[in-house]
């Protein structure tokens, strides 16, 4: 999937199509040139589009001409009949629907990551529809565009040339925290196809339950596919206990191997590849419950990590993966690799013996040993390993693909080392976050990601082609700890998945206002088809304070930190608390400063001279699911000389965790004169983080 090679093919493809249009005296504008109303109905936006005169009625008889095989013709006819039920494809119609492979797909050179095979050309006139592509994938996407253009049985005439920007355009669905029926997954595959997405990543195993039938290890589903507590929260509150199907109150389920074969086949008919994820070595409490012999020795507390020193662990994993590969033809197999604590390994005699025998110095290298061994096994079966970006720690397996979720830096570093990467940073791609003003939303996980923020993401950014060529694409992830129902799942997926789809497909994105107009239309289409998206028309939006710059006495003044802020949440550094900038609903937006040290927040602000003060206030962020809490104690001291301080205010607060998300302002009002103000905020018994954005003084 070398970028220059693709661009050559794409430009050649484009020049032929543009030349044909030029013969009619028209020029095909790029996406950035067109008027928004011209493509008001299309997501993702096509690479190039021109509106022409007239319309085509999709009713009555239409002559169907194609050069595909009989089986492919039947599939296309079924797709068209479903999309346009009032249209009859036969030989009697005067109007023509022509769908052609050019060159014939059996002669076309195709590779797994070649985006040109997904491109297509579409021309609609009052009497004819022409769709051309070099593969059935391209023809399929051309028909999807045709479906989106339809309005009450009519198609506006136009010319389109189109091909995706990225080869990988995916979504991950967490099936462990909450189990989703097969029919529900098939429904989401229909929506993915409509949006030209081509990868469904199923997170099939985790502490909350094993969801795939493994015939050699039946206890995985017999003992852990059901649990006590219908929701993930209830399960956690009741001690994370597993159950058997016949137990009273048991909740859960799993996919039989036939279920998964059905899902794979349904997806393949829509040119979607299903990628399975089997977590290892962490997030494996359910495995250890079913097969405790895979646990480390001398474990004194709850542990979710497989014992890497135990050779039976590798026998188990290889046997499981053999059954996985028999069901999923995907080139990629995801092995997780994230958030392993590794603590048990340090005390486990078998793990220590493994480290000594392999010359490993750290437990991170021990995990890398497992990853590399699994990669060799998968490579030997013609597959490629994908892992979350923790697999970068220790030593990256030679042929592994990294799924970068903890920001973009790891992904970029991966590409510079010559490895392929799939970008899925939490700030832009995690669909389990609040999508609007948090108090107005169902409980979500962590922070806030609006449709606009999601749409703003560009995986390659301004990276040079030599690096960008290793970015396979992007993926939206829906973790489902706080998503207990199917309607809620769709509420979190849509409309933000529309932004993921356009970010993965479109070369020259339009402005957000244009995209939002198109998203509103697609939202209505989804509702008409039985989906349950968030209603974008009711969106409240970003925190109002973030949209303005504050002016107060402390702006630009010197700040001394007696306790450091966290390196991974620095905001704007030493000036963050006096820069006049408020944070929004996202604690990772670069305006909130995070504190996790023993003393949490402890700073002194020098106003430069003694000044009268009537108000000192600070806003604090709370997200219980992210272990961020408002302070349990705030103390303010003042001084004229910076040496001798007097207490101005000292208050204790009860931290209310009944509300997952809030921004709380704590303030002192009165009258005092001072030059130095020391502000301290401490945590209570809950511990966790403290986040604030500004200490305001008036």
PLM features: what roles do these ranges have?
Residues 385-390, 395-400, 406-548:
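Flexible, acidic glycine-rich loops studded with aromatic residues
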């Amino acid at each position: 999937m070398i970028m220059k090679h693709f661009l050559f093919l794409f430009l050649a493809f484009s020049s032929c199509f543009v030349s044909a249009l030029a013969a009619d005296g028209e020029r095909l504008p790029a996406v950035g040139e067109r008027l928004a109303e011209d493509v008001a109905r299309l997501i993702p936006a096509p690479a190039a589009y021109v509106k022409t005169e007239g319309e085509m009625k999709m009713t009555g008889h239409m002559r169907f001409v194609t050069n595909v095989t009989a089986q492919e013709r039947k599939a296309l006819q079924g797709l068209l009949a479903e999309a346009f039920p009032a249209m009859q494809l036969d030989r009697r119609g005067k109007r023509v629907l022509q769908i052609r492979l050019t060159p014939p797909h059996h002669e076309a050179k195709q590779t797994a990551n070649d985006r040109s095979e997904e491109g297509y050309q579409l021309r609609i006139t009052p009497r004819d529809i022409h769709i051309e592509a070099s593969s059935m994938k391209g023809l399929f996407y051309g028909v999807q565009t045709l479906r989106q253009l339809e309005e009450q049985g009519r198609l506006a005439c136009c010319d389109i040339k189109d091909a995706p920007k990225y080869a990988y355009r995916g979504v991950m669905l967490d099936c462990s925290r909450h189990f989703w029926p097969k029919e529900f997954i098939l429904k989401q595959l229909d929506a993915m196809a409509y949006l030209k997405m081509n990868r469904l990543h199923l997170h099939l195993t985790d502490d909350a339950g094993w969801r795939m039938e493994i015939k050699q290890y039946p206890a995985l589903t017999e003992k852990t596919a059901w649990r006590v507590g219908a929701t993930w929260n209830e399960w956690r509150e009741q001690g994370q206990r597993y159950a058997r199907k016949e137990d009273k109150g048991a909740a859960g389920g799993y996919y039989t191997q036939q279920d998964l074969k059905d899902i794979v086949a349904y997806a393949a008919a829509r040119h979607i590849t299903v990628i399975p994820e089997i977590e290892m070595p962490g997030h494996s409490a359910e495995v250890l419950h079913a097969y405790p012999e895979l646990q480390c020795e001398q474990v004194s507390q709850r542990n979710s990590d497989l014992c890497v020193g135990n050779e039976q662990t590798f026998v188990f994993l290889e046997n499981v993966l053999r059954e996985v590969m028999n069901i999923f033809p995907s080139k990629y197999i995801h092995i997780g690799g994230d958030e392993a604590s590794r603590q048990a390994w340090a005390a486990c005699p078998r793990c220590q013996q493994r480290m000594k025998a392999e010359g490993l110095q750290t437990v991170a290298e021990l995990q890398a040993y497992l990853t590399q061994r699994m990669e060799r096994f998968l490579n030997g079966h013609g597959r490629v390993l994908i892992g979350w970006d923790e697999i970068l720690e220790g030593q990256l397996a030679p042929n592994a693909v990294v799924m970068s979720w903890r920001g973009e830096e790891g992904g970029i570093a991966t590409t510079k080392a010559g490895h392929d990467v799939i970008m899925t940073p939490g700030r832009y791609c995690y669909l389990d976050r609040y999508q609007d003003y948090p108090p107005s939303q169902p409980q979500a996980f962590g922070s806030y990601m609006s449709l606009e923020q999601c749409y703003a993401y560009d995986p390659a950014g301004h990276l040079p082609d030599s690096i960008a060529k290793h970015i396979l694409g992007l993926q939206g992830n829906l973790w489902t700890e706080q998503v207990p129902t199917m309607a809620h799942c769709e509420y979190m997926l849509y409309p933000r998945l529309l932004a993921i789809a356009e970010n993965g497909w479109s070369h020259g994105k339009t402005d957000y206002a244009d995209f939002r107009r198109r998203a509103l239309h697609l939202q209505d289409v989804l509702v008409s088809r039985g989906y349950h998206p968030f209603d974008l028309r009711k969106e409240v939006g970003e925190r109002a304070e973030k949209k303005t710059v504050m002016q107060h006495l402390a702006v630009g003044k010197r700040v001394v930190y007696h306790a450091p802020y966290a390196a991974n949440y620095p905001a704007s550094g030493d000036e963050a608390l006096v820069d006049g900038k408020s944070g929004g609903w996202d604690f990772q937006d670069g305006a909130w400063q995070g504190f996790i040290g023993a003393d949490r927040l402890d700073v002194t602000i020098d106003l430069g001279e003694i000044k009268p003060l009537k108000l000192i206030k600070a806003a604090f962020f709370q997200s219980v699911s992210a272990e961020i809490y408002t302070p349990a104690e705030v103390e303010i001291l003042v001084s004229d000389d910076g040496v001798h301080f007097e207490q101005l205010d000292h208050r204790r607060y009860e931290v209310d965790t009944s509300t997952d998300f809030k921004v709380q302002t704590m303030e002192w009002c009165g009258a005092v004169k001072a030059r130095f103000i020391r502000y301290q905020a401490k945590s209570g018994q809950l511990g966790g983080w403290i986040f604030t954005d500004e200490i305001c003084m008036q």
